[in-house]
């Protein structure tokens, strides 16, 4: 296990005490809000640090008691009984503190752009893409997040060939970022008379929603084209050109949006373009740290098959962490916290292992 950064822990405690004192001194409303934000950010780790210091002090007292020949038998027996429990508590607190002190992903607190595209499997793949979108939509509803569809191309038999949406709320990206990759489904299509199991797939991409401050797009770097917009099946064709296609000339990225309002379409398309460019920057930075990427959950490659949904067996398998659960019906209703938590725990464990390697 990696060693605890004692100096950093002391600095956090010192800063926490300073914030408490300044908040008690009655600062202005603006200053108080900033202090309260930093206080709430530091409080979880400082409370663990203080619990760790208390437990290590207790352990030191027990060690001194056991080393003292003058300690009577009853006290020695009690100390030997308590020692393993306190050692276990110290070890658990060490790991909790290390996790809390891991470098934060700057994008974790952001909202996200969710993109789902039907892959191999024709109509069944489009239906599965629709099922995945509803799964994430229900998960978001349970978290109090807001989902807004930016663009959608419906499948001929239902579902979606492609759907792009924003998922807005605090910490959305931190919970959904491990969903990127190929999701494979095995089930009997409703149109399959022989009862044969078909395999199809959909690709999910989760991007942190970028703000103007994150990425600068120069007007001379984009080309905006307007087109006629149509509804599902070609119906409700607008009489004006409202669909917008934006091409980012330096990268060749193309984004379209086809709602009724041209102004809204341009804003939505720019929102997606900004997030894709921001994601490209993050991917580039990650590839420069390629030596570390072996320690992350999967490779982050969106062509990587990450998960299989087997409907006949009610089984879900996440191939990155060898997780298998048999409650697929509940998963499809949006109950994916168990999977997300397992992926996050695996990621944190790998980061701790990497930290330990660097210290050795």
UniProtKB/Swiss-Prot annotation:
It comes from Sinorhizobium medicae (strain WSM419). The modification N5-methylglutamine is found at residue 235. This is Peptide chain release factor 1. The lineage of its organism: Bacteria, Pseudomonadati, Pseudomonadota, Alphaproteobacteria, Hyphomicrobiales. It comes from the Bacteria. Peptide chain release factor 1 directs the termination of translation in response to the peptide chain termination codons UAG and UAA. Keywords: Cytoplasm, Methylation, Protein biosynthesis. The keyword Cytoplasm applies. Residues 281-310 are annotated as: Disordered. One of its GO terms (cellular component) is cytoplasm. Belongs to the prokaryotic/mitochondrial release factor family. InterPro entries: PCRF (IPR005139), Pep_chain_release_fac_I (IPR000352), Pep_chain_release_fac_I_sf (IPR045853), Prokaryotic/Mito_RF (IPR050057), RF-1 (IPR004373). Coiled coil: none annotated. GO terms for molecular function: translation release factor activity, codon specific. Its main location: cytoplasm. Residues 281-307 have a biased composition (Basic and acidic residues). The keyword Protein biosynthesis applies. Methylated by PrmC. Methylation increases the termination efficiency of RF1. It is found in: Cytoplasm.
């Amino acid at each position: 296990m990696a060693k605890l950064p004692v100096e950093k822990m002391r600095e956090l405690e010192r800063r926490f005490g300073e914030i408490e004192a300044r908040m008690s001194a009655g600062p202005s409303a603006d200053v108080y809000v900033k202090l309260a934000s930093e206080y709430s950010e530091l409080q979880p780790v400082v409370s663990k640090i203080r619990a760790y210091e208390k437990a290590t002090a207790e352990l030191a007292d027990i060690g001194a008691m056991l080393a003292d020949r003058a300690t009577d038998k009853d006290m020695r027996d009690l100390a030997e009984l308590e020692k393993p429990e306190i050692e276990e508590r110290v070890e658990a607190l060490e790991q909790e503190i290390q996790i809390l002190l891991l470098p934060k992903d700057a994008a974790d607190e952001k909202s996200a752009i969710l993109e789902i595209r039907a892959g191999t499997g024709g109509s069944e793949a489009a239906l599965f893409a629709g099922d995945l979108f509803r799964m994430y939509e229900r998960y978001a509803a349970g978290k109090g997040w807001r989902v807004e569809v930016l663009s959608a191309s419906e499948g001929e038999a239902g579902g979606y060939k492609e759907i792009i949406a924003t998922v807005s709320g605090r910490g959305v990206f931190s919970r959904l970022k491990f969903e990127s990759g190929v999701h494979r489904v095995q089930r009997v299509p409703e149109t399959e008379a022989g009862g044969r199991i078909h395999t199809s797939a959909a690709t999910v991409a989760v991007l942190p929603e970028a703000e103007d401050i994150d990425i600068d797009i120069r007007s001379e770097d984009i080309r905006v084209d307007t087109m006629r917009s149509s509804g599902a099946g070609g119906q409700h064709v607008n009489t004006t050109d409202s669909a917008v296609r934006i091409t980012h000339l330096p990268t060749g990225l193309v984004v379209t949006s086809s709602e009724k309002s041209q102004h809204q379409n341009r804003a939505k398309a720019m929102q997606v373009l900004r997030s894709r460019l921001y994601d490209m920057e993050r991917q580039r930075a990650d590839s420069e740290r390629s030596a570390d990427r072996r320690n992350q959950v999967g490779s982050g490659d969106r062509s990587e098959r990450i998960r299989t949904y087997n409907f006949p067996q009610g089984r879900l398998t996440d191939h990155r962490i060898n997780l298998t659960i048999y409650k697929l019906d509940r998963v499809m209703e949006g109950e994916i916290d168990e999977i997300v938590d397992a992926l996050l725990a695996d990621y944190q464990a790998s980061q701790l292992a990497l930290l330990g390697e660097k210290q050795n």
